[in-house]
């Protein structure tokens, strides 16, 4: 048998082994791992390319390790059966052997350890009131997350909360921010997952990670699994996609079905900027699909106000409304960038000032200095380097600072981007 034939046979056998392993058909899995390893060793013997040899060696080590664990497990299981038989005959013998599941438990512990970092221990401290607009989305999440925990008696006799919610919309509209609010308000175990947490270079490990994730969520319910950029894990099927990608998708489908069968307690919360690329079967598992649109004028005004926060400013509510009118088509992220640029203007005024004047600060009850025009009657010539830093009073933000920032910062989305989301909402979604 030629080297390419040996390698293809080895890959075919190891895929069968992994399928049996995932299905917990351990005797068959062990047998196929052994056969696959024989063919891998033959391929290694005839392979001339050093790089290819190294790849094959790493695979041999991985599958050999798994086969050894299965061997220990199967031997211990046989010992337990024999032990039970001896007990039934009145001959009890002590044993120092590990428990039957110890070999497999060590593998599960390793996977769980990799997922532990995804559990949010410290809450993000984002409240519903910190999010401007998106009232429909907030109400849907409260209905799904908070009410079943606070009023469990209402969710019986066929009344069940949603087990899958998809948040979709253009980038920067607040999908991840909503998830942070859920994590803060829910008081549930919160798993924050990205593709890097679940994708492994080792064959078969990615789907085992997915399975362990859902098992951990069920054990620690009420729990929420938040998957950001879920399209990177569960995109539409195509001829060109990898076997690994197909396996991850299949495992997600199986586990999300399992969530539904396992009654309430586990919510899968997905977020994506490109919902039309999701696999249709995955899309169906998200029973509630909520569009997170660009903010309206009222929400934009509130965003300006929230982003300015406690920074000293002269802006009025009317100024915030005026800025909202000027930023039609801006996302929440765009507005955040506008504010970040605007609040640097007082710093720039200090940095470029050639004249300062003395002012009395009521808060500290002392005289400070602040930048001013050279024509100011109280002005004295100086740069910020010649002034005691502790004596400089920060100039207040003005609406002109924001006008300047809006001119510099352009929206990141165009009409074509919005149209795609609008069409998807007509076909599959609901307004947020």
Swiss-Prot record:
Catalytic activity as recorded in UniProt: ATP + H2O = ADP + phosphate + H(+)
SUPFAM superfamilies reported for this sequence: MIT domain, P-loop containing nucleoside triphosphate hydrolases
PROSITE patterns: AAA
Name of the protein in its database record: Suppressor protein of bem1/bed5 double mutants
Cellular compartments per GO CC: cytoplasm; cytosol; endosome membrane; nucleus
Gene Ontology molecular function: any one: ATP binding
Region feature (Disordered): 83-103
Gene designation: vps4
Location of the MIT domain: 3-80
Binding sites annotated in the UniProt record for ATP: 169-176
Phylogenetic lineage: Eukaryota, Fungi, Dikarya, Ascomycota, Taphrinomycotina
Membrane-related topology note: Peripheral membrane protein
Major localisation: membrane
UniProt keyword Metal-binding, yes or no: no
Key words, A-Z: ATP-binding, Endosome, Hydrolase, Membrane, Nucleotide-binding, Protein transport, Transport
């Amino acid at each position: 048998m030629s080297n390419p034939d040996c390698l293809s046979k080895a890959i075919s056998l190891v895929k069968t082994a992994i399928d049996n392993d995932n299905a917990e058909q351990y005797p068959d899995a062990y047998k196929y791992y052994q056969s696959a390893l024989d063919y891998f060793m033959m391929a290694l013997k005839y392979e001339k390319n050093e790089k290819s040899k190294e790849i094959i060696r790493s695979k041999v080590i991985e599958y050999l390790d798994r086969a050894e664990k299965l061997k220990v497990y199967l031997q211990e299981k046989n010992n337990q059966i024999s032990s039970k038989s001896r007990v039934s005959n009145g001959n009890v013998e002590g044993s120092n052997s590990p428990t039957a599941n110890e070999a497999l438990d060590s593998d599960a512990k390793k996977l769980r350890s990799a997922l532990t970092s995804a559990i949010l221990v410290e809450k993000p401290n984002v409240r519903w009131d910190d999010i401007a607009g998106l009232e429909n989305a907030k109400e849907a999440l409260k209905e799904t997350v908070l009410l079943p925990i606070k009023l469990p008696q209402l969710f019986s006799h066929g009344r069940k909360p949603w087990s899958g919610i998809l948040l979709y919309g253009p980038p920067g509209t607040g999908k991840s921010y909503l998830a942070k609010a859920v994590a803060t308000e829910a008081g549930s175990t919160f798993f924050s997952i990205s593709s890097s947490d679940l994708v492994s270079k080792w064959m078969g490990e990615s789907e085992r990670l997915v399975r362990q994730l859902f098992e951990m969520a069920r054990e620690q319910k009420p729990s929420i699994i938040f998957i950001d950029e879920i399209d990177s894990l569960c995109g539409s099927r195509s001829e060109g996609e990898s076997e690994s990608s197909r396996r991850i998708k299949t495992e997600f489908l199986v586990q999300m079905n399992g969530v539904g069968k396992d009654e309430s307690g586990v919510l899968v919360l997905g977020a994506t900027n490109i919902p039309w690329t999701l696999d249709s079967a995955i899309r169906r598992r998200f029973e509630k699909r909520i569009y997170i649109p660009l903010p309206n004028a009222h929400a934009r005004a509130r965003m300006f106000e929230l982003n300015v926060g406690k920074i000293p400013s002269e802006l009025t509510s009317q100024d915030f409304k005026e800025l909202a009118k000027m930023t039609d088509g801006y996302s929440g992220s765009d507005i955040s960038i506008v504010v970040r640029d605007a609040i640097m203007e007082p710093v720039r005024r200090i940095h470029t000032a050639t004249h300062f004047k003395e002012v009395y600060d009521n808060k500290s009850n002392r005289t400070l200095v602040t930048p001013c025009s050279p024509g100011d009657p109280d002005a004295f010539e100086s740069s910020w380097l010649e002034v005691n830093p502790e004596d400089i009073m920060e100039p207040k933000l003005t609406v002109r600072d924001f006008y300047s920032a809006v001119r510099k910062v352009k929206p990141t989305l165009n009409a074509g981007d919005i149209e795609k989301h609008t069409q998807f909402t007509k076909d599959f979604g609901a307004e947020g």
